[in-house]
Amino acid sequence: MYSLTNAQKDLQLKARDLAQCAFAPTAANTDVTEAYPWANVDRLLTEGFMGMTIPKEYGGQGRSYHDTVIVIEEMAKACATMGRITVEANMGAIGAIMNYGTEEQKKIAAAAVLSGDKPAICISEPNAGSAASEMTTRADRKGDRYILNGEKYWITGGGVSRLHLIFARVFDDGVDQGICAFICVREGNSPENLVVGRRLYAMGVRGIPETHLEFRDLQVHKSMLVVPPGGLKRGFASLMNAYNAQRVGAGTVALGIAQGAFEEAVTYAKERQQFGRPIAEFQGLQWMISDMSIQLEAARLLLHAAACSGESFPDIAMAARAKIFAAETANKVTNDSLQIYGSSGYGRHNPMERHVRDARMFTIAGGTAQILRTQVAGSILDMKLPQTRGGFLPK
């Protein structure tokens, strides 16, 4: 059983106040306009909720992942878009750079996030999704620079992010050295060799653009190489470690969305009258509400446990278990909450249909529930999944 310290309870209340006062009132408009909420991001920054995990010596707060998931849930409960932005501003790319980067790289990344940037982690490609190690974006060594060519797909924050962590297959004198990561900071308008392609309009969490990115002879200095060559044992494994934290964050966004939907459904059940009494008095709905509360609390326990596991990053199996359960719980709870609303919840005037759409992505993005189940099985069986083959091989 987890428990929050007094300091964490204060942090939770601070996050809740900001989310409910500033982000909840604009959530519907963000969904409709599909515009990046710059003003809300500014508030997130000024209130100290960006760069929370960055060490104090680089200007951050040095907070734990446990602290961070407490904040993420509150943000996501008010607005799914702000929940995701909170994840990206504290986990994922920034975590990889702060753990594996040089001093110069850490300073660059910290400065970007602490000025309000949401870093973009660039890994997925049109033909390399779950099988990420099959990526074809390449970086050819030329003197003191690498020349990047290729295409990335479903890049969260494409077009609004300045700091990019780009994963590519490195070639030195034509020899494949494995997968590495590079920092690229986009200043002003996108240069010709870093092309922001078409936006991929999504079903939910619509306030953050998902885009194609194309690299056309993009030059990156060798000093911006974050994860050195080494194939699956070094570069790629390091990337997956950074993803553990991001998966816990994504699962927490799903939890926040579901918790918000659940609370709205409970209020509605108490107020809605049918057959001369509140529908909350009917046993069928009581059982639905009871089951939802059990599932939500179980998801929260798993997420908090995962956030506290591991060393630099959460444990891979714990992160996978937590994300699977939280994401599937969110899909069920939002659908059951809509069911309690009936036809009213199905209408676009009601936030419930938005909650259902927002929750749907989390069994897919950041690792599908099926791939993550394979990771969990691998940890139990002491085996791993080589993504290039799609089957198990001994370690």
From Swiss-Prot:
**Any GO MF annotation of the entry:** hydrolase activity
The entry describes its oligomerization and partners as: Homotrimer or homotetramer.
So where does substrate get bound? Answer: 243-244
Which chain positions lie within coiled-coil regions?
none
Q: What class of enzyme is it?
A: hydrolase
Cofactor dependence is on: FAD
Entry EC number(s): 3.13.1.4
Where does the record place the site Important for activity? Answer: 84
User: PANTHER family recorded for this chain?
Assistant: ACYL-COA DEHYDROGENASE, ISOVALERYL-COA DEHYDROGENASE, MITOCHONDRIAL-RELATED
Give the similarity note.
Belongs to the acyl-CoA dehydrogenase family.
Q: Which reaction does it catalyse?
A: 3-sulfinopropanoyl-CoA + H2O = propanoyl-CoA + sulfite + H(+)
Q: Which Gene3D superfamilies match?
A: Acyl-CoA dehydrogenase/oxidase, N-terminal domain, Butyryl-CoA Dehydrogenase, subunit A, domain 2, Butyryl-CoA Dehydrogenase, subunit A, domain 3
Kindly state what the record says about how the cofactor is bound: Binds 1 FAD per subunit.
Entry keyword set: FAD, Flavoprotein, Hydrolase, Plasmid
Stated name of the protein: 3-sulfinopropanoyl-CoA desulfinase
- Pfam families reported in the protein's UniProt record: Acyl-CoA_dh_1, Acyl-CoA_dh_M, Acyl-CoA_dh_N
Please state the gene responsible for encoding this protein: acd
